[in-house]
């Protein structure tokens, strides 16, 4: 928990927007909160935490990266010219993994909260896990679910644990 009420309010205000559906709402990596916050865990353990939200690897069927049937071009801080959205998303995600993280959190799904089936997330899930393993970054996998205690959610976590030999919950 956070003891400083003002810091907690500021951190909450800096959370990214989210919405249902297929449209990508993240456009670039965002540090949340902007400055690391102190959290008290069980006992006397205190940690400083800051998350990084990024698009991640593209999922088949997602919307927002195309405009009039063509890949959207976006400006990034890494190039002096526009590049395709998918390329920017992958580049930003890789930079977050390699340059800005000490512990990774891969967020995937059992397919329960959107109209995209679980299978459409598998390539992106595999790619993220492979990147983290290749760099020997510690990480865990979270299965986002509308029904976290359901058999489907448990089976998704078990599949990931078995397939990748990693912790998933």
Label each region the model flagged:
Residues 1-78:
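Conserved G1/Walker A P-loop phosphate-binding module
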Residues 42-45, 95-99, 161-162:
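Solvent-exposed alpha-helices and their adjacent loops that cap or buttress functional pockets
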Residues 46-50, 102-103, 138:
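Loop/turn-to-beta-strand initiation segments
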Residues 56-58, 110-113, 146-149:
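Conserved nucleotide-binding/hydrolysis micro-motifs of P-loop NTPases
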Residues 62-114, 131-132:
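Inter-motif core of Ras-like GTPase G domains
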Residues 120-126:
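Charged helix-capping and loop-helix junction motifs
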Residues 127-140, 145-169:
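Canonical P-loop GTPase G-domain recognition
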């Amino acid at each position: 928990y956070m003891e400083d009420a003002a810091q907690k309010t500021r951190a909450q205000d800096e959370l990214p927007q989210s919405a249902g559906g297929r449209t990508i709402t993240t456009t670039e990596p965002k540090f949340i909160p902007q400055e690391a916050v102190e959290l008290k865990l069980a006992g006397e353990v205190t940690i400083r935490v800051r998350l990084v939200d990024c698009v991640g690897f593209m999922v088949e069927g997602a919307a927002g990266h195309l405009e009039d049937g063509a890949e959207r071009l976006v400006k990034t801080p890494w190039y002096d010219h526009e590049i395709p959205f998918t390329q920017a998303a992958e580049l930003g995600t890789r930079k977050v993994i390699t340059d800005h993280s000490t512990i990774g959190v891969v967020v995937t799904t059992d397919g329960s909260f959107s109209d995209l089936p679980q299978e459409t997330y598998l390539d992106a899930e595999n790619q993220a896990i492979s990147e983290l393993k290749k760099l020997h970054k510690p990480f865990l996998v979270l299965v986002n679910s509308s029904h976290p205690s359901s058999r489907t959610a448990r089976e998704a976590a078990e599949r990931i644990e078995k397939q990748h030999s990693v912790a998933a919950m």
